[in-house]
Amino acid sequence: MVSWLEQIEASALSTWLRESDAMYAFPGILIVHTLGMALAAGSTAAMGLRLLGIARQIPLTSLRELVPVAWIGLVLNIGSGLLLVVAYPTKALTNPIFYLKLLVIVAAVAVVRHLDRGVLRVAASPRKLVPTALLVLTALAIVTGRLLPYTYRHLMAGH
């Protein structure tokens, strides 16, 4: 597995992403990833908190307006995340925490889709399990993402 990761890491794009002084290279990608996380996590956290009863004056159906914000954040994170993986493929793809992060994000997306199809379309209050799961998954996505720079097992770049 490592040999194909080394090939990606030796590519011109991977090297440029890691080593370029251009602001739109690695630092810019990190900024886009952070903004995407803010949009996705912020909107899903707002949904989860409202569904748990916080800010009851906001109608549940108004939460539907946050769903596109979450999708925009997810799209930004997918695009920037792919570039971050290209920059350090060995570091990312040999780290079990990376796969946990992806699993958590897929689960959070499933919860948001469930909410969008049901609860957010009517003014009914869901059980506490779904919004609690959404908040926990949102927090786990952030935590696992923040752990990635510190939990890698293999780093090929620069050797």
Language model: regions and residue ranges:
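Polytopic transmembrane helical bundles with strong interfacial aromatic enrichment
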Residues: 1-159
